[in-house]
Amino acid sequence: MEKVINNTYEDILIEEKIGSITLDLKKFNLLEYVIKTRLILYITKKIFGTANGIEKKHVEDIIILCGNNIGNKFLTPNKNLKITVRNKKIYFEKQN
């Protein structure tokens, strides 16, 4: 499963910087629900080194936000992470 998630991540990745990851919204929305949830946790681990603080409800809210495809909306599942949907992209950003 980890290999599938890693390959999917590489496929939909637009840009990766320290503390920030940008994904293609259209490709993300085409994924299966299980892959989306694992991918969100994978990205959180990639940014912070752990997925602690991200609960099932947060992951569901992120998937709903992306599925609604409404621009300029964001979520802050915890005080350190901000997820924004803008310009057909998903931005995962570490907050300082």
How should each PLM-predicted stretch be described?
Residues 1-96:
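AMP-forming adenylation/ATP pyrophosphatase catalytic core
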